Amino acid sequence: MAERRPSGLERSPTAPPVLSNGHFASIGAEGDASSYEHGVQVIDENKEFNPDLSKYLSLENVTPAGFNYHLISVFGSQSTGKSTLLNHLFGTQFSVMSELERRQTTKGIWLSNNKKQGDAGSAERMADNILVMDVEGTDGRERGEDQDFERKSALFALATSEVLIVNIWEHQVGLYQGANMGLLKTVFEVNLQLFLKDKHTTHRSLLFFVIRDFIGTTPLKNLQKTLLEDLSRLWDTISKPAGLEKSTIHDYFDFQFYGLPHKGYQPDQFVTEANKLGLRFREGHRDPKRDALKGEFSEGGVFLPEYHRRIPADGFSHYAEGIWDQIVNNKDLDLPTQQELLAQFRCDEILREVMIGFDEAITAFEDKQAESVRVGAPEVLGGLGVAMRAARVKTLKSFETEASRYHKGVYQRKSAELQGKVDTRLKALFHGQLSAAHKSGIRDFSDSVSAAVKDGQKKGGSYDFAEIVAKETQSSLEKFEEVAHSTLVDGASWSNCTQELSLFKKELAEVSARLRRDEMRRLATRVERWVQSRLGESVGLEFNALGSGRAGGGAPENGEKPTEKDFWDRIWNLFEETVLDAERRFTDRASSFDASIDEVDVGLWRLRRKSWGVLRAKIEEEMIEGNLLLKLRENFEDKFRYDEAGVPRIWRPTDDIEGIYTRARESTLTVIPLLSRFRLERTTAPPPLDRWIGHTPSTATPADEEDLAPIGGVDEHEGKSLEEEMTILSDAKRQELTVRFKKAADGVYVEAKRSAIGGMTQVPLYFYGLLLALGWNEIWAVLRNPAYFILLFAFAIGAYITYQLNLWGPMLKMTEAASQQALEEGKRRLREFLESSDTGRQAIAMSAGERAGSSGRKEEYEMSDMQKRASNANDDLDDM
């Protein structure tokens, strides 16, 4: 019987004046645990959801049940005994209709826990934690044509419940409205949209038709056949989404049918059958031998695993509220999404909780690593691996314990998300640790090798570079592997140091190769300096000896001394011998570096190119215009001033100065074209520089070539031929050099000519006759006197010998020099005497006035004298 509710001041504004299920906890009612003893209102008639649903579940000890609970809903027409049926099946105390008033009793949706647990020792007992929802009936006069709540409540029941009990009377079978076919059609249409949201899982529900007032006249099988046919036709008429046109109702729903006797006419049978029906609400399994399409249904437990919505009990309240919010706001209901939202809500909460502990364990390491990277000094963190492994295991295990009961897909996704977050941070730490170990290892390796090399050099320069590299490489690898293995995290796919170890080995090899190249560069530099020193000496000697008759250049070809024709052959042979010796030195030393054949080839190739550059630079140094002109003059003077025996010539008027000059000049001029091009005498062609240097090795890097000067005939891209590379003097330089040499040679010739003319005394012929006439007596006196005669004879012999030895010129020059020196010495002594005596000082003062007057005349005289001398010199040159 319905009771009157409290006054308006005491009840909720949304509560009706007549109390329905007044002994239940309704929405807006406040009370203690006793008010939830019989159940709770989930949704009121105004479509308001009860936020205290979770409180009721906690009081009934359902919240910690996890998945060990079941939800049943009942719907059907109003006043058909739905609440009565639930009370008999589950021992609940839902309010029932007053038979005297025939009005609506259940308003909204109410929920109660199963009060019938059955015998614990019985083989057949009801399942634990059965939650029963009593849904407001349809087709009531109170709602009239407003079927909105009917559809929403039915959809809510279908979306949340495993089993939907459809309560109908036997005489309503075959009817459309009486059998709630219109409502089922709407539910089916919307439900198809729900199933489309999750194509990986087909959610099934059980529609349990309880046929009331079953008298048995029409067999139950015929009734269920009629209902199935109606449901199938109803299914065929609904609009199906794309891809589900050929689907059947059995793809989404299972069906059970049970007939109950008339409660008023057969009360005992009704109670008995209701008890039997109640025992059906237990866990069961699908019987593969029964075909639902043929009307064969299992009579065992109705709670099949596929019916469960897999919503943990502690999240059901939040899930149901979300479902109702979707329904009441006329949004497309998406059950998988709602389940995912619930799971996401709970998993997010759990995730945040477990991440707090993770942060406490890891953040300090992250900060320290970030700081070391910021300052540019990566540091290997001690104890990182232990902390990472412990934090990961604890975090993932805690999340699994709390969140694994929720929607599998969401749990897996959130678990993957958590694992992703954890692994992302741990992976960053892991790679940061390996990066620090990598960088510090490379740095330490390079420093250790350099230190060992320097130590070896200090001890005497004898060290095995390859042995040093191998030792330090092994040490670096052991340190890196120790750090990497101590940082590995079990179970993490990214926790693998194989790639990093491979990269570390690769970079060690690259650094080793770079250090080896640097060491070989230093070796090459030392060898190049040695080549430069050797070539500088030997080539300098050849150029110094160029064309010197005394040194052999001007000697005949069949003589013991080399000729000028094979000058470049000697230079090239010296060059080849020197470089070959340098290559042996380089190869022998490079073998201790464990250098590859390719590296040695590159080193030798560079050495040959560098050596040619040294030779070319030395030749250019020797061939500087001033140096070359001096060498040509020396060459000319050696041939002009000295005879074939190397004796200096004393020019006499009778000597063939012009012939000797011409031969010496022409011989020297032949040296200029010889020196202008580097050609071998034996082949009359430039040396095979391109073959001697060889092709660029395939392993040569741009760094190996960047400091090399281009060589004509070898580097084709330079556009310079071998002939151009071997050209030492251009045509213009040759012509200029020839002109300048001829001028210098002419000067030497003029000097020689003057020397010959200056030694000749011009005595008139009549002087000899006058001398004979006037000195006849003296001549006879000398001839008759033996002493005079002997003295004259000795003087004549001395003069003859002097003449034959061509010593008159030197003797005259010596005499002139001695007399000049005596004159200068006399002038000096006279000046000292005049300055030291009074008489001398007075004489100097008297001559000072006269000197000023005569200065003009003196300058005029000196200028005239200079012009006269210049005119005489030009006349002498014209005469020669």
Curated annotation (Swiss-Prot):
EC class of the enzyme, as a word: hydrolase
UniProt-annotated stretches for the region Disordered: 1-22, 836-880
Amino acids binding GTP: 76-83
Lineage: superkingdom: Eukaryota
Coiled coil, from the record: 496-519, 856-880
Membrane topology classification: Multi-pass membrane protein
Enzyme nomenclature, EC number: 3.6.5.-
All ranges on the Cytoplasmic side of the membrane: 1-762, 808-880
GO CC term, one of those recorded: endoplasmic reticulum membrane
One function term, GO molecular function aspect: GTPase activity
Keyword Cell membrane among record annotations: no
Function of the protein: Cooperates with the reticulon proteins and tubule-shaping DP1 family proteins to generate and maintain the structure of the tubular endoplasmic reticulum network. Has GTPase activity, which is required for its function in ER organization.
Family annotation (HAMAP family): Sey1
Name of the molecule in the record: Protein sey1
Gene of this entry: sey1
